[in-house]
């Protein structure tokens, strides 16, 4: 079988010390590895110098906002519970939500949280997932009311590879400066590097466009089948404003800031769907057909994200750059350094 289709072909070894537990401070002091595909040139610089490398292009950002999706509570017996909200079921008659619950629960069990918030376990699903309904003062909560309450009592859901509790600084650090549409349970991390000043400077030279893709917990779900074509990609809600669609439909060169932007642009390029659910899986055998350039962080081995990067530059080239980044002590994952692919 073609090595590009084998899960084991996307593996690499990373020392724990290279996993960033906190972002660079200031954020634009993060390092930036630039790879120019045309000339096969590699540059090592800092993120604040990004503008010096950008060609004439429109820049697309994901303006999703991370929910405080992790809450701690108790069962009626007093046993402790941790609930991680994933997403609402949009088509259900009653407001129901998909959640992951740490701790054994039964169908119809009631869980208790701060601010008189209660959750009823409606259904036990596979992979430790649960369908739940939320109440406050015996009134069923819809998405908007629940998100407002989570803003008071919830915690920012840091990724599983950040081995610490969330802190006050994460409220700002794990949210992009242009985040406005509430609904993600993970940040579009390439966006986290941008300060207000840097963003405004970019605006002076480039047309900026926003789209929304609510990053789901599926972004952390590993690929389990050796033949990656058998992987079932998670589905995430997206919305693209008309103005942004017109740019995608044009011949204007596009830089996508982050893998979520890339998947949304490429889904639209294939389907002409402006709003809905994106489950596009990009890899070397299913490469991008529209987006020209990519700004992204360094991703987990064997993840759909490293496969997406490989779709742009080839698997072998991707692994070579990752090997170089490790040698040069770049910081990896959500709070880590960035890579620009031209």
Curated annotation (Swiss-Prot):
Swiss-Prot/TrEMBL GO biological process terms = queuosine biosynthetic process; tRNA wobble guanine modification
Q: In which pathway does it act?
A: tRNA modification; tRNA-queuosine biosynthesis
Q: Look up the domain of life of the source.
A: Bacteria
* SUPFAM superfamilies from the UniProt entry: QueA-like (SSF111337)
- Molecular function (GO) terms listed? S-adenosylmethionine:tRNA ribosyltransferase-isomerase activity
What's the Enzyme Commission number for this chain?
Answer: 2.4.99.17
Q: Which UniProt keywords apply?
A: Cytoplasm, Queuosine biosynthesis, S-adenosyl-L-methionine, Transferase
Which Pfam families does the record cross-reference, listed alphabetically? Queuosine_synth (PF02547)
Q: Which HAMAP family match?
A: QueA (MF_00113)
Family of the protein in this entry: Belongs to the QueA family.
Name recorded for this polypeptide: S-adenosylmethionine:tRNA ribosyltransferase-isomerase
What is the organism of origin for this protein?
Campylobacter jejuni subsp. jejuni serotype O:23/36 (strain 81-176)
């Amino acid at each position: 079988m073609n090595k590009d289709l084998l899960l084991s072909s996307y593996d690499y070894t990373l020392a724990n010390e290279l996993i960033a537990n906190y972002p660079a401070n200031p954020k634009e002091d993060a390092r930036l590895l630039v790879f120019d595909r045309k000339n096969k040139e590699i540059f090592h610089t800092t993120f604040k110098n990004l503008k010096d490398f950008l060609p004439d292009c429109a820049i697309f950002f994901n303006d999703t906002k991370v929910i405080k999706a992790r809450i701690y509570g108790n069962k009626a017996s007093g046993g402790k519970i941790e609930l991680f909200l994933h997403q609402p079921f949009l088509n259900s008659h009653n407001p129901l939500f998909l959640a992951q619950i740490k701790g054994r629960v039964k169908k119809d069990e009631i869980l208790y949280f701060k601010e008189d918030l209660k959750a009823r376990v409606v259904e036990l699903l596979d992979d430790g997932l649960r369908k739940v309904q939320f109440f406050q003062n015996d009134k069923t909560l819809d998405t908007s009311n629940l998100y407002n309450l989570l803003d008071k009592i919830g915690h920012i859901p840091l990724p599983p590879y950040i081995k610490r509790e969330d802190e006050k600084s994460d409220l700002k650090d794990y949210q992009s400066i242009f985040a406005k549409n509430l609904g993600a349970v993970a940040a579009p991390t390439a966006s986290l590097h941008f300060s207000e000043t840097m963003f405004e400077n970019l605006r002076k030279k480039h047309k900026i466009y926003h789209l929304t893709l609510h990053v789901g917990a599926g972004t952390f779900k590993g690929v389990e089948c050796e033949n990656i074509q058998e992987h079932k990609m998670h589905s995430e809600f997206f919305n693209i404003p008309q103005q942004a669609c017109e740019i995608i439909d044009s011949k204007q060169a596009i830089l996508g800031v982050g893998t979520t932007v890339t998947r949304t642009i490429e889904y639209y390029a294939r389907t002409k769907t402006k709003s809905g659910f994106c489950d596009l899986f990009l890899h070397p055998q299913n490469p991008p057909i529209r987006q020209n350039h990519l700004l992204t962080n360094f991703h987990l081995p064997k993840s759909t994200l490293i496969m997406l990067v490989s779709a742009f530059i080839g698997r072998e080239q991707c692994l070579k750059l990752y090997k170089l980044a490790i040698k040069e002590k770049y910081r990896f994952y959500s709070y880590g350094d960035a890579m620009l692919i031209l």
